Amino acid sequence: MKVIHLISGGDTGGAKTHIHYLLSGLSKEIDVTLVCFMRGEFSDEAEALGIPTVVLEGSIPSVLKQLKTMIREEHYDLIHSHGARGNFIASLLKGPCGLPMVTTVHSDPKLDYLARPGAALVYGTLNDHALKKADYLVGVSDSMKSLLISRGFSANEIFSIYNGVDFSVVPENPDRLAYLRALGLECDEQSVIVGIAARLDPVKDIGTLIRGFALAEKKQPQLRLVIAGDGAQMEELRALAQGLGVEKKVCFAGWRSDVNTLMAALDVNTLTSLSETFPYAITEGARAHLATVSSRVGGVPKLVIEGETGFLFPAGDAAALGEKLARLAADPALRRRMGEALYEKARREFSVEATTRRQLDIYDEVLRRERLKKSGARRGVVIIGAYGMGNSGDDAILEAIVGELRQIDPFLPITVLSRRPKETRERYGVESLHMFDFAGFHRVLKGTQLYLSGGGSLIQNVTSRRSLWYYLYTISQAKKCGNRVMMYGCGIGPIADERDTQRICRILNENVDVITLRESASLQELQRCGVTKPAMAVTSDPALTLPEAPADIVTAELEKFGLAPDGSYICFSVRGWTGFDEKAKAFAEAADYAAETLGLTPVFMLINRDEDGPATDEVRALMETNAAVIDGERNSSLTIGLLARMKAVVSMRLHGLIFAASQGVPLVGVSYDPKVTAFLASIGEERCLPLEELTAENLKAAVSAASAAYGDRDTRKRTADALADAESENSAWARKLLGL
């Protein structure tokens, strides 16, 4: 494999480090050539590292002519560009040379020229044009991939990579006090040194660092701060430090080329950026075993796990930063423990070897796709379900399925039909079409291998016959267009209108290869309908495999709704349904009972943010005690994390029960649909009350029993874990149908 890399040659900071590390690793595995458009520190260092480097200076027409000759004579397979100038030149070369163009996006293009409107107008515009011409984009971190998707780039043509560092390098500073004093810092043996290496630009938000440091220093006067970097904000930041009265404890060290020596002189590494991809400042600090405090931006949470490998704070929140710095300053053992944990995680997952391997895998995937385009072979999956309709349960199923497919093949192109395709693209990192874009659907089916009817109760007609006909139509069209067809961890029924039974039987028997079901009741319904030809297996709901969100994220969400993180709560999840109005009073009395007798604060959670509000309001209006409402948009992991904080959960919504069951929380199910009864039976849960039989007394009794059962949480979680293990059969069948 031969790859030509194009870059201006004037780059500094993380982009320079990334390319030097990456090409040093790649040059040991494949033929790479680095082309710079100016000679300077960048090209000199690349040559010193042994990277084959060519400097082409001159006009754009002259450079293009030379590059076309190089590419033709050297038989390159790929053009890989970096930065505005490299991207622009690559966009002019890809057509004439007939090569795919891969572009790495190292930072947010809209922030690259912050406070430089002239440069933004010229270089930013050229870069925007070039990025749209690229065949494939590589975002430095998953967050950059998400950002590019939100800007309208195709999710299936974007890959992610993380900056890796060379862990064979050991940062050393034998006389750190002398070094720090030489920088101009007043310090002694008792000083705790906080540092940052960053440009003094607005996006790095050094002002928040200084404000947070000033707050921490009031509690821990031994703190000192070293700011290593240069930029337009230097005088503004000096004035800020003076205004806060910490100018004698803050050292502006200017730009430092001896980053490893600097890191070895610190006790705490920091990052305060408003936006990042995956900054080297974090991994370089990890290599030096430094305790780290970072803003929660970009891919940083992949490495810095709150309370384990470091501390995170909301970008721009000086008070939160100050609290973390003060805590680390007061506890040397905590600094050592976090520094070691960060080092071990970074060494395992974010080494230069891991980055090199990832880039090689991306190249292999790009070349494979180019070959498939030429041969007309199929690749990819299309998923259909009740997605983008505001229901946390259905969206959780999609999240789980996408995660399982990524484990099968991390580069698998995935397209999802959704009611809100933009939201689906951005949230799950997949391509998405509107569910009624039939022309687009047929176009996608002509190139995919596998159609997945993705979980949930799609084959039912109790809510609508038309929705049933829609899903059956998509199944038949998928098979007609040459796809394998799988119904993935789904529920079946109720089939209330028997006029549809024959159609269900015919279409499923003729078109479906595999059906996996979330409980045995669904298998019985299929058998009753006469479905016999597909391979069928009882597994479980894909959503059971989803993790809960990190503890600090859950705590912040509780506090947003005025709930103490250590409070005692009972959750209610209700929905509108036939006969609900007559039962709303029973829910209200049970919630009041939980508050007044059991000491549990009622919390209502909207699982379907579009539909559950009116039913929730109806119950709350009938209550005598106060109750909180958790509403708004949130991902599945956060919903699971919130439910994990409850002492008991009372839910009509199936996925409210599934999420809570996965965390071992005691349940009370109010069944309006056989799927609720079937799930509770599958986990051996007896507290299931049919909606039509619900009374205040039997609901209060169930709530009391659930509250009393809280201490036996581990037993219930083992049952849910067993179901999660059974769920793996879903992805095993998908792997088989994909031929992997």
Q: Where are these predicted regions, by residue range?
A:
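N-terminal strand-loop element at the rim of the active site
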Residues: 5-61, 144-149, 159, 232, ...
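Nucleotide-sugar donor phosphate/pyrophosphate-binding loop at the beta->alpha transition
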Residues: 61-65, 100-102, 110-133, 146, ...
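A short, active-site helix/loop in glycosyltransferases that binds the activated sugar's phosphate group
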Residues: 132-159, 165-169, 515-533
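Aromatic "clamp/platform" in nucleotide-sugar-dependent glycosyltransferases that forms part
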Residues: 255, 274
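Active-site anion-handling motifs in enzyme catalytic cores
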Residues: 369-740
